[in-house]
């Protein structure tokens, strides 16, 4: 999670003096990155996944399961050359710290080759090894669970050993600071978000309505006076009918599944980034796995808005809200005291933007519509790629920018206006953690100032430039232009996580091969993000997506690539070019026949019926894709460019139009399988067995 520098992190009061220094030098570093890597070509399609685990202490005698906060030494052991690192390297796995002291992040030690079918077949095995190696070197009662959220986080005793919520960093009423990673960055990050904001984060989730449910969060302490902030839930931070959470740990203590893919060049990365933007809320809904927070069943199924609220450092004025009684409108922003009268009489223009208000370093104080952790605000524009589908009207969100940064990127960096706008939007933020030893850097060789801002903008997608290297470095051996896909929730089993990881990567590779047009206005993507939070949204709701007939692909070219292709391939009825020989009279499964997956029978099909998706980890309610719409979405005449589809339709297709699955299967049939058979010693029988 972000940069883990060795050194002394500055408190907010100290670090805010260097905010402009970090932004200015970060942009210099970014300009140098573009100079070094802007014309880079022909990088291999490499990719990797990040799985986040929770260490859970099971007491069979007392029948309890609690988050383990004293076994974090395991990460050091797994990275110690004298202990477990040689074993981890030999097993091709790598381990990293996360926000929670009870958390472990694990990745493959080397990226997968996205052009090799064998690497896709290896993913689950690698994930199994990651879990086992870590678990085998912990006490037997400590288990690694891939839970999106720990259901009882914030309840009375939920940690092992027990710890009290009285920490100075978070000042939480519910979470002890002992859940936070011991590295100095993390408690400083927690405290600095609160100090910049001027009050604690306030996360309110709707309680799931039931006849026996009290629509009141009665877990909020009424008489605690340990910190001044203890009164906040009673002066406006909490809402009736909602669960109240007040700490970064409720969000950043969640686990997710993230995928990073390297493209051949920057233009391809821009097209992939834009193409995945409308898919992000679809995959958030499909992977939903978080129906319980702080011991309450909530009226939503995912973690996203919880994490968004948990790292929301915006002040009252940046959010356009009235402050709590006795609280400052500008929170912890660095402003001149003598400006108080003018500040209290600030004006806004017709768009709601603030006029003539600045911090001491000259940065305008702006309205900021979204948290640092949210969906993307701008497409990057594919007009420099082969496709050229983008139109300006697709970027229809209010996304304020840092004008000085924008102008520098245009004038000095020679970036086009869309790329400059992307980074200028990220750089409206302040750095949250600055290490005193890292204030001065070599902008030709280091990029920590850039990453300080870049890595603390946690969006559904992250456009990842390469790092800076010396002139004699062979850049082909270093990571290139990458896209990180970030919305998915972690799943309970390695099989599920491997399936989601391989699916989104195969879909991305299929997008690059077949070049569909998925652009819709980002305002529709934002509606989809809200829809994805709803209970059973995968089963019950329709999502905005580009009309099937406008994907710019020939549907007939995908006719032979439903799930039946696998049956034909396995039974020897496939022609050399990957097409299915439909004239063969051998026994065949129909589209609606069950397919055996991982030892269990799962119904999958190529139609838009409800049997293709049964349930997510966030639901156990009745099955079926009824395609119900929600009240907040009205029919809009947009000339048929965008339509509302069930997730079944988007995944499996509808009528003559292919969905995501057929794109993936055709990629496997015409690209990965022929390459595997032609370029290796493996036989078709061995490939089928694998």
Curated annotation (Swiss-Prot):
Pathway as given in its UniProt record: Sulfur metabolism; glutathione biosynthesis; glutathione from L-cysteine and L-glutamate: step 1/2
Start-end of Low complexity biased regions: 574-585, 598-619
Database matches in Pfam families: GCS
Signal peptide residues on this chain, from the entry's feature table: none
UniProt keyword Nucleotide-binding present: yes
Keywords: ATP-binding, Glutathione biosynthesis, Ligase, Nucleotide-binding
InterPro entries: GCS (IPR004308), Gln_synth/guanido_kin_cat_dom (IPR014746)
EC number: 6.3.2.2
Catalysed conversion reaction: L-cysteine + L-glutamate + ATP = gamma-L-glutamyl-L-cysteine + ADP + phosphate + H(+)
GO molecular function: ATP binding; glutamate-cysteine ligase activity
Region (Disordered): 574-620
Family: Belongs to the glutamate--cysteine ligase type 3 family.
Protein name as it appears in the record: Glutamate--cysteine ligase
Name of the coding gene: GCS1
């Amino acid at each position: 999670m972000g940069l883990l520098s060795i050194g002394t992190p500055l408190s907010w009061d100290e670090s805010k003096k260097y905010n402009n220094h970090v932004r200015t030098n970060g942009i210099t570093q970014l300009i140098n990155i573009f100079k070094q890597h802007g014309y880079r070509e022909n990088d291999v399609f490499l990719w990797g996944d990040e799985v986040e685990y929770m260490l859970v202490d099971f007491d069979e005698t007392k029948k309890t399961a609690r988050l383990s906060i004293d076994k974090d030494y395991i990460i050091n052991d797994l990275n110690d050359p004298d202990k477990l690192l040689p074993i981890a390297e030999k097993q091709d796995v790598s381990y990293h710290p996360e926000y929670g002291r009870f958390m472990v992040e694990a990745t493959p030690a080397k990226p997968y080759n996205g052009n090799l079918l064998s690497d896709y077949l290896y993913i689950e095995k690698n994930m199994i090894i990651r879990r086992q190696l870590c678990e085998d070197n912990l006490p037997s009662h400590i288990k690694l669970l891939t839970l999106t959220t720990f259901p009882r986080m914030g309840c009375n005793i939920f940690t092992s050993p027990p710890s009290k919520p009285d920490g100075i960093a978070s000042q939480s009423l519910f979470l002890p600071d002992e859940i936070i990673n011991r590295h100095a960055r993390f408690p400083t990050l927690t405290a600095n978000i609160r100090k910049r904001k001027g009050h604690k984060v306030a996360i309110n989730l709707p309680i799931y309505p039931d006849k026996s449910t009290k629509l009141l969060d009665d877990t909020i302490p009424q008489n605690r006076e340990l910190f001044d902030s203890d009164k906040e839930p009673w002066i406006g931070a909490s809402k009736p009918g909602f669960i109240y959470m007040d700490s970064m740990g409720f969000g950043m203590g969640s686990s997710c599944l993230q995928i990073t893919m390297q493209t051949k060049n920057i233009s391809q990365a821009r097209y992939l980034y834009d193409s995945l933007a409308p898919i992000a809320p679809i995959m958030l809904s499909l992977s939903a796995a978080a129906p319980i927070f702080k011991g309450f069943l909530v009226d939503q199924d995912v973690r996203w808005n919880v994490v968004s609220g948990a790292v929301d450092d915006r002040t009252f004025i940046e959010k356009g809200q009235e402050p709590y009684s006795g609280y400052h409108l500008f929170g912890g922003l660095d402003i001149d005291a003598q400006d108080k009268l003018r500040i209290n009489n600030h004006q806004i223009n017709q768009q709601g933007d603030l006029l003539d208000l600045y911090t001491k370093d000259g940065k305008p104080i702006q309205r900021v519509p979204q948290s640092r952790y949210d969906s993307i605000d701008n497409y990057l524009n594919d007009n420099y790629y082969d496709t050229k589908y983008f139109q300006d009207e697709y970027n229809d969100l209010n996304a304020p920018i840092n004008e000085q940064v924008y102008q520098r990127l245009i004038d000095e960096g020679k970036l086009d206006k869309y790329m400059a706008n992307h980074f200028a939007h990220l750089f409206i933020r302040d750095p949250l953690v600055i290490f005193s030893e890292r204030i001065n850097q070599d902008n030709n060789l280091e990029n920590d100032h850039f990453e300080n801002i870049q890595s603390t903008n946690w969006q559904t997608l992250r456009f990842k430039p390469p790092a800076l290297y010396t002139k004699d470095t062979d850049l082909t051996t270093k990571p290139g232009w990458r896209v990180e896909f970030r919305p998915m929730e972690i799943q309970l089993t390695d099989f599920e996580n491997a399936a989601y990881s391989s699916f989104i990567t195969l879909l991305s590779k299929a997008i690059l091969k077949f070049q569909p047009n998925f652009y819709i206005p980002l305002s529709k993507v934002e509606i989809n993000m809200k829809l994805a939070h709803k209970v059973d949204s995968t089963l019950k709701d329709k999502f905005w997506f580009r009309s099937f007939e406008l994907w710019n692909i020939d549907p007939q070219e995908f006719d032979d690539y439903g799930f039946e292709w696998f049956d034909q391939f396995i039974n020897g009825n496939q022609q050399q070019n990957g097409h299915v020989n439909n004239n063969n009279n051998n026994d065949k499964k129909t589209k609606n026949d069950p397919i055996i997956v991982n030892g269990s029978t799962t119904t999958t099909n190529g139609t838009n019926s409800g049997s293709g998706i049964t349930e997510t980890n966030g639901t156990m309610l009745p099955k079926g894709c009824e395609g119900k719409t929600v009240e907040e979405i009205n029919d809009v005449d947009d000339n048929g460019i965008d339509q509302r589809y069930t997730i079944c339709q988007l995944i499996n297709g509808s009528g003559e139009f292919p969905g995501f699955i057929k794109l993936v299967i055709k990629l496997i049939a015409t690209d990965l399988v022929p390459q595997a058979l032609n370029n290796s010693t493996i036989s078709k029988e061995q490939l089928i067995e694998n």
